[in-house]
């Protein structure tokens, strides 16, 4: 499974990029706003660090405006993927953009039915939200599994990006469910490399080594 980082913080991306594990990155208007910088500036810098798909989201809510915004964003870098919300106007925009060769990532997916519609419209990626489904008592991982099964049956090339990842177990679960990609927050990536038994083991090795000196 591919690993994307879900952040607009360049310092976080720089740190994780040194691990050599990043296949891409996702941003959204909330993450960009948190950084207090212009979208174009942030996205350009991310593209210079991560060699893979970088999702940048439109903020318009009607098809024509989305398409115009998407075309401008796509000019920033060859790795830009246009993030578009799952709604009727968004699906119309995805259809237009796919015919122009502009890659899209349909976000705010909460059901396999939505994922199927987005894929049929020409989306390069779909982003089902795992954590937010869990928040309302539904099973976000099961949704990923259903989407993966449907895409496999019908040989749909759209890639699944498991989003709204809250903890390391989510990453494990979506990998087992067949997601092509997980977009993971910085905090969760840092948690993934840690384990209390690893820390105990390192301490024991050092203790034994120092005793032998």
From Swiss-Prot:
Source organism superkingdom: Bacteria
Classification via Pfam families: TAL_FSA (PF00923)
Entry keyword annotation includes Disulfide bond: no
Entry keywords, A to Z: Cytoplasm, Pentose shunt, Schiff base, Transferase
Disulfide bonds: none
E.C. numbers: 2.2.1.2
Function: Transaldolase is important for the balance of metabolites in the pentose-phosphate pathway.
Reactions mediated catalytically: D-sedoheptulose 7-phosphate + D-glyceraldehyde 3-phosphate = D-erythrose 4-phosphate + beta-D-fructose 6-phosphate
GO molecular function: aldehyde-lyase activity; transaldolase activity
Any one GO biological process: pentose-phosphate shunt
Enzyme class, first EC level, given as a word: transferase
Protein name in the entry: Probable transaldolase
Record keyword Cytoplasm present: yes
GO CC field: cytoplasm
Active site per database record: 83 (schiff-base intermediate with substrate)
NCBIfam families reported in the protein's UniProt record: fsa_talC_mipB (TIGR00875)
Gene of this entry: tal
PANTHER family documented for this protein: TRANSALDOLASE
Record family assignment: Belongs to the transaldolase family. Type 3B subfamily.
Annotated InterPro entries: Aldolase_TIM (IPR013785), TAL/FSA (IPR001585), Transaldolase_3B (IPR022999), Transaldolase_3B/F6P_aldolase (IPR004731), Transaldolase_AS (IPR018225), TSA/FSA_arc/bac (IPR033919)
Pathway listed: Carbohydrate degradation; pentose phosphate pathway; D-glyceraldehyde 3-phosphate and beta-D-fructose 6-phosphate from D-ribose 5-phosphate and D-xylulose 5-phosphate (non-oxidative stage): step 2/3
